[in-house]
Regions:
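N-terminal alpha-helical "arm" segments
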Residues: 1-42
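Beta-strand-rich solenoidal segments
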Residues: 3-15, 48-142
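Intrinsically disordered, low-complexity segments enriched in polar/charged residues with Gly/Pro
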Residues: 26-27, 34-36, 41-44, 49, ...
């Protein structure tokens, strides 16, 4: 089914509001410790991140996933180390959300790489991946 979001333009039911109100207060947040948890494996030069189902909240939009979602990226070139970010991106113009891996740089600088424009486009950090051409060096969860 993918990711369904409430809080963009459209109908919001009492049930939706009850679910959302329990997540308010911490920005951004997830409902439980395993919600949107990221598991990472490497196959050749491909980075595979499986994101568990759950609920996530940020800036008035609650996203619910009821199945494991997979996003992919690539390892950096030989001799390089790179910080990449697994994020839940919300797009208010398209009224959509998606999971993606955002390539970073040689140092942990999520605030300089991720978009944070609530009401326009926002990327909620789920995990930081420290990658080298040899594979996953470290994963830092939210």
């Amino acid at each position: 089914m993918g990711i369904v979001c409430k809080g963009f333009d459209g109908v919001l039911t009492e049930y939706d509001w009850a679910q959302m109100s329990g997540l308010m207060g911490n920005m951004p947040s997830v409902k439980g410790p395993d919600d949107f948890r990221v598991g990472t494996t490497i196959q050749g030069s491909t980075v595979l991140c499986e994101v568990l189902p759950g609920q996530a909240w940020a800036h008035g939009v609650m996203c619910t996933s009821n199945s494991v979602e997979t996003v992919t990226g690539q390892l950096p070139g030989p001799g390089e180390t790179r910080y990449d970010y697994v994020v839940l991106s919300r797009d208010w113009e398209q009224n959509t959300a998606k999971l993606e891996i955002v390539p970073g740089g040689r140092a942990e600088r999520a605030r300089d790489v991720l978009r944070a424009e609530p009401g326009v486009y926002h990327q909620q950090l789920l995990a930081t991946l420290v990658l080298s051409s040899n594979g996953l060096q470290q994963q830092l969860d939210r």
